[in-house]
Amino acid sequence: MAVKIKLQRVGKIRTPQYRVVVQDARARRGGAVIENLGIYQPANQPSIIDINSERAQYWIGVGAQPTDTALALLKLTGDWQKAKGLEGGENTVKPQPEKKSKLDIFNEALAEAAEGPTAEAITEKRRKAKEEAEAKAAAEAEAAEKAEAEAAEKAAAEAAEESEEASAE
């Protein structure tokens, strides 16, 4: 029986994902599978290529013929070179970048929220009303200080008068 290593399309529309499978050469693309070797997700950056190296080399050694795209993937992972005894059998697939855990993202957002908003979102009317309220509060504070100063002056003047009257007696 002629056996091929093919890509079997799975996934949604416009989101291609493939399984790297071993099938009978005459089987249709979505047909019966002898063995599933791995996955290929080209939509991710960088692409995800995860192929079981040991099983891929076994099937190549037994005589399974890869399709052109499957051959390109097997060359990237180095499985084709290892099975055929060629040089350059190292895996050249770029590793996926480390994702932040949800706990780290949550803690960063919590720390940012604790610092408070970085900019105020205030309309023009509210800004003017806020400035007027601050000016009014400042004017009231000044009036209160003047009243206290005048009361202190009166108290000092009365104390001076009492001391003069006491010394005159």
Curated annotation (Swiss-Prot):
The keyword Methyltransferase does not apply. Keywords: Ribonucleoprotein, Ribosomal protein. Residues 129-156 have a biased composition (Basic and acidic residues). One of its GO terms (cellular component) is cytoplasm. Residues 159-169 have a biased composition (Acidic residues). InterPro entries: Ribosomal_bS16 (IPR000307), Ribosomal_bS16_dom_sf (IPR023803). Residues 114-169 are annotated as: Disordered. One of its GO terms (biological process) is translation. The keyword Ribonucleoprotein applies. Signal peptide: none annotated. One of its GO terms (molecular function) is structural constituent of ribosome. Belongs to the bacterial ribosomal protein bS16 family. This is Small ribosomal subunit protein bS16. It comes from Corynebacterium urealyticum (strain ATCC 43042 / DSM 7109). The gene is rpsP.
